[in-house]
Amino acid sequence: MNEDLMKHLAPRPGRYPLLPELSPRAEVALICRMLFHEGYDDHIAGHITVLQPDGTLLVNPWELAWDEITAADVLRVDAAGKVLEGEWNVTPAIGLHLAVHAARDDVKVIVHNHSRFGTLWANAKRVPPVYDQTSAQVDGDIAVFDEYGGTVDDAAESNAAVAALGDRKWALLANHGVFVVANDLRQAHLRCLTLEWRCRQAWHMEALGAGHPMPQAVADRTGAMIDGNGFPFLFEAMARREIRLDPSVLEG
């Protein structure tokens, strides 16, 4: 978030803090639930990794659906994926995450799932057009990785996916799902919901058989501004919703 810009745009303190103080594990549990309600809801599939200052990673457990995870359930693993803290197990498909974290110093958060509309476009091996402002909240090309062999726990396949991603923010994994990287949790949340919204809106527009994509220059300018500066208060609002729905998300 661009703090200097926020001081100018939102100088008033508000009536109360937007969120309670959250532990890193609580933030992971919250984003799991937030994204579940944005369409990242393929049962127990999908994984989120968050790089910590000591080089370890926080990751959701293999056994649990994203909408039931609490802070106490979140695992800590080392750079090789070995569980250091936690009572659950880590998915064997964590290899792609580990490879990207190792290859890119700018990536602190990685999200992978088989989102409802993102996976449709991944199956079509097509990048969805941008039709509206919300779809344009994030700029940059979407990579399409078209070498899926049925798993991403193979080192060679993970390395190929890393190469296909390059320095991009997101990718469609053909016949599989979506893959999003970010510098922090708030940016990851914005990028994930923007990708799924964009995929959903484009699907509906194609079903309608009408509509005109946003001019590329306008989409690029919009995305550079919003993704570059952050979307004020969005993460906090969606996190509060999850806490209202189930305060136990913060337990642990």
Regions from the PLM with identified roles:
Residues M1-G252:
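Glycine-rich flexible loops
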